[in-house]
């Protein structure tokens, strides 16, 4: 997810680790040169691109700079032409409180805790690591188990791997509806320790283990609805767990690029990245809330999400911004699909221990994660039955 500043990381990590990262920086080049370290083309803004090494990627993230890695598709800018954008009218009110009431009661903090404790037990979920593949395999099995336990497999509900060249695969679970119009809920499964990504532990409890288990729990409970499970909803619902978000939104870009090329009808995408940290808000003497991102998102979808939070959560929302390419919703936007993002708090109050060994389960509130799970479940159900 979002990047910590070098100053914030220095307060958490040993000085030698900071020095090691800074010493690896080299001057930026305009293009890759034979014989030098491999370069990647990143996009730091709608009109700003740069060739960088992998070490320079991590140094930028330590300075709080977000980016797309667009090496695979350098000609695709963030801002697509207006006629290429998917235009969707979202519901003006929530309508399924009666159907959702018994489902909301089934959301379990204990399930989320148990899953997150196991998910963070992998040494790292770095997208190029062996344990990153192992963690993805475990997560895939949990999604598969939720489908089997609900009996939804007999109704064509399925989970598939979306393979990538770097090892760790993304995961896509599909709940078919009566049409191919599709609503996507996403989180990223990878983690990173910015000091030595391929070596040091990266528990990634909040970033983004919290979002991963939040949407997993919403997925599990959504399958308890016979109407959804049996394909009676108007729209198809997909749950995505992306690989390689930390490296420049690589996994989500690959998926939405594929969807664009194959003409998939994606009506909405909601990202859940960092859903568990509330201490920054409460220590500041502010009211616990969820943060609705307002920059680089679809305004209509964001307005609908405000209605969902008001209708189904027991805490309010606060409007906030996270900057360019701050999480996987930006990949959906890059390919013309309406996207939105809800984070754990106002952005400045969010977890400052991400990307270090200090991003651990004990710092998180499962009561707060339950609020995100309620929102995710309600969002999925409401849009499943909406005319989009």
Curated annotation (Swiss-Prot):
<dbReference type="GO" id="GO:0008235">
    <property type="term" value="F:metalloexopeptidase activity"/>
</dbReference>
<keyword id="KW-0645">Protease</keyword>
<dbReference type="InterPro" id="IPR007484">
    <property type="entry name" value="Peptidase_M28"/>
</dbReference>
<feature type="propeptide">
    <location>
        <begin position="20"/>
        <end position="88"/>
    </location>
</feature>
<feature type="binding site">
    <location>
        <position position="207"/>
    </location>
    <ligand>
        <name>Zn(2+) 2</name>
    </ligand>
</feature>
<keyword id="KW-0732">Signal</keyword>
<protein>
    <recommendedName>
        <fullName>Leucine aminopeptidase 1</fullName>
        <ecNumber>3.4.11.-</ecNumber>
    </recommendedName>
</protein>
<dbReference type="InterPro" id="IPR045175">
    <property type="entry name" value="M28_fam"/>
</dbReference>
<feature type="binding site">
    <location>
        <position position="188"/>
    </location>
    <ligand>
        <name>Zn(2+) 1</name>
    </ligand>
</feature>
<feature type="binding site">
    <location>
        <position position="273"/>
    </location>
    <ligand>
        <name>Zn(2+) 1</name>
    </ligand>
</feature>
<keyword id="KW-0862">Zinc</keyword>
<dbReference type="GO" id="GO:0006508">
    <property type="term" value="P:proteolysis"/>
</dbReference>
<keyword id="KW-0325">Glycoprotein</keyword>
<comment type="function">
    <text>Extracellular aminopeptidase that allows assimilation of proteinaceous substrates.</text>
</comment>
<dbReference type="GO" id="GO:0004177">
    <property type="term" value="F:aminopeptidase activity"/>
</dbReference>
<feature type="binding site">
    <location>
        <position position="355"/>
    </location>
    <ligand>
        <name>Zn(2+) 2</name>
    </ligand>
</feature>
<feature type="glycosylation site" description="N-linked (GlcNAc...) asparagine">
    <location>
        <position position="180"/>
    </location>
</feature>
<comment type="subunit">
    <text>Monomer.</text>
</comment>
<keyword id="KW-0865">Zymogen</keyword>
<keyword id="KW-1015">Disulfide bond</keyword>
<keyword id="KW-0964">Secreted</keyword>
<feature type="binding site">
    <location>
        <position position="246"/>
    </location>
    <ligand>
        <name>Zn(2+) 2</name>
    </ligand>
</feature>
<feature type="binding site">
    <location>
        <position position="207"/>
    </location>
    <ligand>
        <name>Zn(2+) 1</name>
    </ligand>
</feature>
<dbReference type="GO" id="GO:0005576">
    <property type="term" value="C:extracellular region"/>
</dbReference>
<feature type="disulfide bond">
    <location>
        <begin position="322"/>
        <end position="326"/>
    </location>
</feature>
<dbReference type="Pfam" id="PF04389">
    <property type="entry name" value="Peptidase_M28"/>
</dbReference>
<keyword id="KW-0031">Aminopeptidase</keyword>
<dbReference type="GO" id="GO:0046872">
    <property type="term" value="F:metal ion binding"/>
</dbReference>
<feature type="signal peptide">
    <location>
        <begin position="1"/>
        <end position="19"/>
    </location>
</feature>
<keyword id="KW-0479">Metal-binding</keyword>
<comment type="similarity">
    <text>Belongs to the peptidase M28 family. M28E subfamily.</text>
</comment>
<keyword id="KW-0378">Hydrolase</keyword>
């Amino acid at each position: 997810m979002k990047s910590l500043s070098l100053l914030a990381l220095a307060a958490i990590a040993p000085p030698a680790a900071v020095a090691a990262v800074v010493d690896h920086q080299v001057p930026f080049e305009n293009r890759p040169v034979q014989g030098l370290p491999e370069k990647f083309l990143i996009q730091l803004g709608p009109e700003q691109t740069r060739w960088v090494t992998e070490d320079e990627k991590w140094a930028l993230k330590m300075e709080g700079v977000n980016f797309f890695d667009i090496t695979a598709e350098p000609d695709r800018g963030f801002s697509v032409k207006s006629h290429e954008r998917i235009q969707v009218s979202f519901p003006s009110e929530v309508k399924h409180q009666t159907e959702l009431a018994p489902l909301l009661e089934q959301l379990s903090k204990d399930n989320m805790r148990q899953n997150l404790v196991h998910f963070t037990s992998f040494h790292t979920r770095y997208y190029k690591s062996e344990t990153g593949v192992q963690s993805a395999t475990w997560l895939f099995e949990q999604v598969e188990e939720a489908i089997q336990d609900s009996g939804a497999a007999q109704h064509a509900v399925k989970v598939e791997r979306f393979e990538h060249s770097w090892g760790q695969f993304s995961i896509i679970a599909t709940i078919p509806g009566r049409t191919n119009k599709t609503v996507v809920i996403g989180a990223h499964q990878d983690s990173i320790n910015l000091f030595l990504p391929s070596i040091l532990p990266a528990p990634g409890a909040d970033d983004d283990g919290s979002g991963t288990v939040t949407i997993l729990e919403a997925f599990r409970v959504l399958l308890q609805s016979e109407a959804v499970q049996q394909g009676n909803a108007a729209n198809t619902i997909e749950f995505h767990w992306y690989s390689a978000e930390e490296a420049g939104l690589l996994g989500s870009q690959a998926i939405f690029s594929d969807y664009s090329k194959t003409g998939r009808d994606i009506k909405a995408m909601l990202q859940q990245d960092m859903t568990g940290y509330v201490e920054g808000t409460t220590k500041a003497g502010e009211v616990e809330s969820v943060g609705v991102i307002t920059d680089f998102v679809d305004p209509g979808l964001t307005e609908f999400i405000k209605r969902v939070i008001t209708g189904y959560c027991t805490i309010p929302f606060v409007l906030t911004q996270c900057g360019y390419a701050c999480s996987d919703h930006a990949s959906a936007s890059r390919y013309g699909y309406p996207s939105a993002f809800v984070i754990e708090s106002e952005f400045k109050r969010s977890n400052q221990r991400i990307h270090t060994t200090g991003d651990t389960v004990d710092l998180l509130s499962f009561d707060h994660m339950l609020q995100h799970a309620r929102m995710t479940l309600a969002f999925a159900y409401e849009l499943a039955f909406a005319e989009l």
